[in-house]
């Protein structure tokens, strides 16, 4: 139910993004998504200290070295790769700080299988996650999504409704307000079809080397676009 409500509420906002994307394809000389440039993060606090563990996904904050594991009542997580990013990107009046990126292998507890079942039929799987801070530096309410799309070097592309954390980072952000939390996407998932077993096995042997995040456009309280989306590429 939480996933359905999240999708319903944010679908209205991203309708504008979809419309803009279609227009961009039709008019090659028009507006384009631009690459974001990192800003200084020296004055920012460590928001991970105040983070409340997710109710669906195993807490990974103690996983700082490859090979480390952590288990709780939601499952067992193994850290496969990590990148401390700590860079801030400007999207108009919105500051998006990417704190870190991790590749995690997760074996969910049996009680959590149904939650992940709509995204994968695998009993255990890898996912890529980022911890972000998002801040509205203006005095007026805006609407924005830190990750509207994510793609990997494997050729996989995920939109915002494939996020496994659902920490309400998308949508309205009051003037001067900040949000912090995780966004994560299951990668290299099996197709669930017997005839695709060979292709699934090949996917499992390949490595995630980078991801590219595309934010949403930024909209004002009347859903008028005020800033273009940004693209952010992060390498492990």
Regions found by a protein language model. Name each.
Residues 2-10:
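Sec-dependent signal peptide recognition
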Residues 5-6, 19-89:
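N-terminal, intrinsically disordered, polar/charged segments of Gram-positive cell-envelope systems
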Residues 12-19:
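C-terminal motif of bacterial Sec signal peptides marking the signal peptidase cleavage site
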Residues 18, 43-65, 149-159, 173-236:
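Surface-exposed edge beta-strand/loop patches
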Residues 68-123:
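Low-complexity, acidic Ser/Thr/Pro/Gly-rich terminal tails and inter-domain linkers that flank the onset
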Residues 107, 114-166:
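Mid-length scaffold segments of soluble, non-membrane domains
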